[in-house]
Every structure is written in structure tokens, then in C-alpha cells.
Amino acid sequence: MSALRAVFLLAALALTAAPVHAQQSQQSLRMWFIDMEGGGATLFVSPTGETLLVDTGNGGQNATRDANRILDAMRDAGVTRIDHLVTTHWHGDHYGAMREVAGRVPIAHFIDHGPTVETAQAAVDFLRDVYPTLYQGARHTVAQPGDRIDVRGLDITVMTSAKRVTDRPVQGGGAANPYCAGFTPQEEDMGENAQSVGIHVRFGEFRLLHLGDLTVNTEYELMCPNNPIGSVDLWVVSHHGQPISNAAVLVHAIEPRVAIMNNGTRKGGQPAAMQVIHSAPGLEDLWQLHFSQLSGQEYTVPGVFIANGLDEQLEAMPIAPITPPTGRGGPPAPAHNGQAYWIEVSARPDGSFTVTNARNGFTKEYR
């Protein structure tokens, strides 16, 4: 083969290979579950390259750290703007780094449940003085149950907002929920958690549910007497894996194949919630952003499914779960401010998907 012919052959191969790679990317819904140390931030990138960010992590002294982690995930995704930002509720671990993120990348559409129902001064000040300046010149939507979020190639439905639930089932939902009869209500939650904007995402045959920090009584209102969701492939564990959320009336009814928990080193993963999660019908795996001291080895998952450790690694993780300290006098949670790793998901229209732990490269395929 002449040198000139070889050059032309290599060029032809390059031209034919590029569209194949682009086509594979266009056929996947990609998601980054970002470590917010027990806060929330999940980045969705649609097959058309549109972006949806759910929550923006912690504020205060951790705002810059969490904004940097969100921007790192965006760089990994190859995106430079947020088309839609959903703030599930007005707690500082879910909206805290919004100003820092908005100062570094454009955000086209801000979505929330409306005003805060709490009196925390930080949230009141943010909503009065900062938030309007961020969505000025952009779109701002107060979400209503049943609303659709317009992302090409995806069907995104608002299931809950402002403590109200949808009365219209998504495709595959609507059957009677057999777990309603066994539900035990908790004390009524009049705070922000129950106000959470919750969404259902459908991409072909793939289905995901993300309900923010929705608490058990509103889970019941959503799921009973009929299950409007049906089953899901991927479930974002509610409220970081805390037992004031994650009732069996939700978790067992939706029969998730895989769950991802955005917990912290000592936030979420309590035994009562973990028992419900681990016993969910059809659950293949639970992935965690952290080992939780509140789970201990008794309730946690094998290390390959855990994305992050501690700044000062313990010689041995405790077997028994610990009881979370009460009040403000307890010792601080184990620190993790160094390298943070996300859990990445790539879903395909046939319902199959891949989950990857960025810390160790462990990947598992679900078909």
C-alpha cells in the first residue's frame, strides 16, 4: 500500500468513526450524582445535550466547595450551561451554592415550589434579596404537580410540589397500591421537606424517580390508594436515606432495580430506612455517595458501591451503626473536604443502564 493511499484510508476511518461515537452519545441519558456531603446535586444531560440540575448543595463556608464540585461534573459532561435548575426545597443543603453556581455558568430556567414555609433567616434573606436577582432575565416557574419540564428526548413530570401531589399517573402507573394498608403515619411535617418538588423522568423504557426530601405522610398521599408511578429502574433515595422519609408504601411499591443514596459521613443511612430499602422487592443494588456511620457495616453496602471516604481514613469501619448525636453539642461528623467522587449513570432507551463509581472505576451493567 502506498503512503498516500494509507493517509487517505486513515482519514476515511476517522471520518466514519466520529459519527458512531456521536451517535452513541446521542442515544444516552447521562447523570452525575455529585457528592455534596449529605446535600443534594444531580446533573442530567439529555441525548440532545440539554441539561437539568436538581439542587445545588450546601451554602455558607461550603458553598465554594460544592459549586466547584458541580462545575467539575459539568466539565466532565462537556456542558457549559444549565437549561433547567430544579430546587426541590429551601433547605441550605439543597440550594446553598446556587449563587456561586449561577455566578459561573448561565442558568436559563429556575424551578421551585414557591416561597419557603419556614422562618430560617438564611432562606428568608436569600429568597428576598438574592434569588430574584438570579432569575431576573431568565425563566422562573413555580412548579405544580402534573407539570412537564421541557427537555427534548425526555418526559419529565412533576409528581409533587408544595405538599401537593399529582392526580394523574405517568405511563405504567395507576394500579392499586397493596402497601397502603400497612402504612403508619408519622407526626405531620409542616416544614420544607414535605414541600419538595419531586420528578419522574422517562427516557424510552428507562424510568427514574427523584422526590427530594419528601417525607412519609406526603409519600402516602402520593402513593395511595393507587400507585401513580408504577415501577422504576433507578430511584434516588429520598432525604439522604433518613427514616422520616422512605416509607415502604413508596419504596416497595415502585420496585426500584437500583437505588442511589446521596448521604453524608454521618447523615442518612439510619437502620430503619436501610431496612426498608434493602427489602424493596426487585432491588438489585444500592449505591452510596458515602459510607455512613449511622449504618455501620451492619446495613451498608460493599465498598465497590461507595463513592467517597474520609479525609482521615479510619483503620476500621464500625460494624454496628451509631446513634446520631442530638442538639448542637455533639462532635462534628467525620470530615471529607478533599477529592470528591461522583456516581455516573448512562441510560439507554431500551431501559438498560450502566452505573460507574468514579472513585474506583467499578462499573455494573443493568439490562
Regions found by a protein language model. Give the residues of each.
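Non-globular, low-confidence helical/coil segments that flank catalytic cores
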Residues: 21-367
